[in-house]
């Protein structure tokens, strides 16, 4: 599934990994498979890992944007000018 321009390939050789879970978590995973949302526990875990990787990618992208903003220094425009520009970009003609 693409995320911020990053495409990961999931069709690779599979490795086996054993995971120990408390009973409550095991029951939760079994419930997810019994609901029909996932075919088996492995599919559920792979989906969790994909989502975690996508989340990490988004956080890294956001951090790059924050760093870029911090590195750009203090701007010369006033708060009023910044708000006016934001309203113009949003297509709003009046102050909120």
From Swiss-Prot:
SUPFAM superfamilies: Ribbon-helix-helix
InterPro entries in the record: ParD, ParD_sf, Ribbon_hlx_hlx
Keywords: Toxin-antitoxin system
One biological process term in Gene Ontology: regulation of DNA-templated transcription
Membrane-spanning intervals of the chain: none
Coiled coil stretches, renumbered: none
Knocked-out gene: effects: Cannot be disrupted, suggesting it is a functional antitoxin. No visible phenotype when the parDE4 operon is deleted.
The keyword Metal-binding is annotated on this UniProt entry: no
Reported function: Antitoxin component of a type II toxin-antitoxin (TA) system. Neutralizes the effect of cognate toxin ParE4, but no other RelE or ParE toxin.
Family listed: Belongs to the ParD antitoxin family.
Protein name as annotated: Antitoxin ParD4
Originating species: Caulobacter vibrioides (strain ATCC 19089 / CIP 103742 / CB 15) (Caulobacter crescentus)
Gene this protein is translated from: parD4
